[in-house]
Amino acid sequence: MEMLQGLLLLLLLSMGGAWASREPLRPRCRPINATLAVEKEGCPVCITVNTTICAGYCPTMMRVLQGVLPPLPQVVCTYRDVRFESIXLPGCPRGVDPMVSFPVALSCRCGPCHRSTSDCGGPNDHPLTCDHPQLSGLLFL
């Protein structure tokens, strides 16, 4: 009986290993296409731009006894390599710099979230919400 249980366990483990080696059920951390709303205080317009951002699944762990042991650091999908592109917002009044920069993800990684450079919160309910009217044209510089 023990031998049969051992063979069954071995069979289940070998099938699980083959299943786990395939493409993950959740997409891993990687650059994806996204549309961002860009506006600036003092300029009466909002422009949407197409860029790449980091998104996807990063494996994390939680302690079972959370009250006894300190929490484990959690990782997020964040930029590894990034460049910034700039656009000129049309219609800005004299004295207001019309240039606005936005990130373009070149590669991503799972790592700690640095609040100084990233939004560490969850997804926004309205990521394309603007305070000003939207324009459809872009001026890349």
Swiss-Prot record:
Family assignment from sequence similarity: Belongs to the glycoprotein hormones subunit beta family.
Protein's name according to its UniProt entry: Lutropin subunit beta
UniProt lineage: Eukaryota, Metazoa, Chordata, Craniata, Vertebrata
Assembly notes: Heterodimer of a common alpha chain and a unique beta chain which confers biological specificity to thyrotropin, lutropin, follitropin and gonadotropin.
Subcellular location(s) of the protein: Secreted
Gene: LHB
PANTHER family, per the entry: GLYCOPROTEIN HORMONE BETA CHAIN, LUTROPIN SUBUNIT BETA
GO biological process: G protein-coupled receptor signaling pathway
Sugar attachment sites: 33, 50
Pfam families named among the record's database cross-references: Cys_knot
